[in-house]
């Protein structure tokens, strides 16, 4: 294979340019910060995740948890199907209340189709179509979780009240 880029004298056979030293140092610092207290961050997220799952399933009827509970679930992941609700409508309803969620994976966000993953694990079309994915981060606090638990039943209730099903 012939080279298409040449480097400076003395390095031309090794690489076609200079290292991005600020980028390398920045990546090192970003990595260090991301992994700092990783286990504590994961423990905290699991607590918030479990609180959301438990409260939503108890307080909002006709809901289904997608995926396992406990340690077999990612610490930042809450995916729930709201029956008689359209997932995309729920994302809009929640965004009007300052809560930002997703109704599907990022790679299919422009398609109004249910998640192929949820269909593959046995969810019915209607169940998968009413799913919402909530992602948690270390930036979220207890007040954020409480706020979601306050506005989510309102949003689901409003959509169900106008649903033809």
Feature names for model-found ranges:
Residues 31-54, 64-74, 165:
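Structural signature of PLP-dependent enzymes
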Residues 21-24, 49, 53, 75, ...:
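A general structural signal for well-ordered alpha-helical segments in protein cores
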Residues 113-165:
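PLP-dependent enzyme catalytic core of the Aspartate aminotransferase-like
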Residues 1-42:
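Conserved core segment of the aminotransferase class I/II
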Residues 2, 24-32, 53, 57, ...:
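Predominant activation on well-ordered alpha-helical scaffold segments within soluble catalytic domains
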Residues 52-56, 61-93:
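Anionic-ligand binding region
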Residues 78-133:
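Conserved C-terminal alpha-helix-loop-beta "cap" of PLP-dependent enzymes
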Residues 1-3, 65-67, 101-103:
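General beta-strand structural signal in soluble alpha/beta enzymes
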